[in-house]
């Protein structure tokens, strides 16, 4: 077993884009997670002051800095949780796993690697985001049983060209296609998700592509005050859903408090923890 998360990550980078569905990706993802958790186990933790209702956060302490915020109620530090989930995923059989447990396992997988990078690499914002893309992209591909594409053909009178996209999964004739943006967080950039969905609807027809973004969290840490907040734009989201395009689901690993409330108002946005995906797949594609 590798003790170097970044070494396993480097191997993952080399093969991922060629075959997102490949089972070896999950093996390498597991190596990244186990090595990160092993390193973090020996790190001190500091409690952060949470300004988010009913949530508590801590950070891992490195030699010169501390990591991003970690949700105490979601974090699982035993790597066996990932190993057990990986076995279930290989069979696409999730008996014995609750929605909450799957969400916690995947949250812990993502946040552990991100925290490792936070305290060991200076100013590296790209690696955590790319790893999260690999993690969610592979899980989605395996659950759906198909590899994604990142370009789609666009035909018009004057030319034939392709449209660059987030991951798009085509399940075959007369079945829906999934449009999968993957983000560590969204902030004000979230309008890009709705805009991209609008383009897909305009080119291919409304309802052909199911917009299902997956997002890690919306937390922001004030390192000086050691405070955690969630940065959310619920009113803007409602406007985007009414006037730009319709997203089928918005999945989070750490569901923001104000976005969770959007399930209860008009226009309803289906904001759910990511564990739901593994149990509602059939209803989404039916």
Language model features by range: what are they?
Residues 154, 171-173, 183-186:
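Short, flexible loop/turn elements at secondary-structure junctions
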Residues 151, 201, 284-285:
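Intrinsically disordered, low-complexity Ser/Thr/Pro/Gly-rich regulatory segments
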Residues 1-138, 143-144:
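Interdomain/boundary linker segments immediately adjacent to catalytic/signaling cores
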Residues 216-286:
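Domain-level recognition of nuclease-like catalytic cores that cleave nucleotide substrates
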Residues 143-161, 170:
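A short acidic/basic microdomain associated with nuclease active sites
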Residues 168-178:
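Active-site beta-strand-loop-beta-strand hairpin of nuclease catalytic cores
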Residues 181-235:
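Catalytic cores of nucleic-acid endonucleases
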């Amino acid at each position: 077993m590798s003790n170097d998360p970044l070494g396993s990550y480097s191997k993952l980078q080399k093969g991922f884009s060629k075959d997102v569905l490949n089972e070896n990706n999950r093996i390498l993802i597991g190596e990244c997670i186990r090595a990160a958790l092993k390193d973090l186990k020996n790190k001190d933790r500091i409690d952060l002051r949470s300004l988010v209702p009913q949530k508590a956060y801590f950070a891992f302490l490195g030699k010169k800095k501390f990591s991003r915020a970690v949700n105490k109620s979601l974090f699982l530090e035993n790597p066996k949780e990932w190993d057990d989930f990986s076995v279930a995923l290989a069979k696409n059989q999730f008996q014995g796993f609750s929605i909450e447990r799957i969400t916690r396992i995947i949250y812990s997988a993502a946040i552990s690697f991100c925290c490792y990078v936070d305290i060991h690499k200076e100013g590296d914002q790209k690696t955590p985001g790319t790893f999260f893309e690999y993690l969610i992209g592979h899980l989605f591909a395996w659950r759906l049983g198909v590899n994604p594409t990142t370009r789609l053909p666009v035909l018009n009178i004057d030319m034939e060209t392709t449209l660059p996209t987030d991951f798009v999964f085509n399940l075959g004739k007369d079945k829906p296609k999934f449009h999968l943006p993957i983000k560590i967080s969204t902030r004000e950039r979230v309008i890009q998700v709705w805009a991209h969905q609008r383009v897909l609807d305009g080119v291919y027809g409304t309802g052909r592509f199911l917009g299902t973004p997956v997002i890690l969290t919306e937390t922001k840490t004030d390192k000086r005050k050691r405070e955690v907040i969630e940065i959310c734009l619920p009113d803007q989201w409602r406007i985007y859903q009414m006037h730009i395009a319709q997203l089928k689901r918005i999945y989070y690993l750490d569901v923001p408090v104000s976005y969770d409330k959007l399930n209860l108002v008009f226009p309803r946005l289906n904001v759910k923890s990511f564990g739901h995906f593994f149990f509602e797949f059939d209803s989404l594609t039916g």
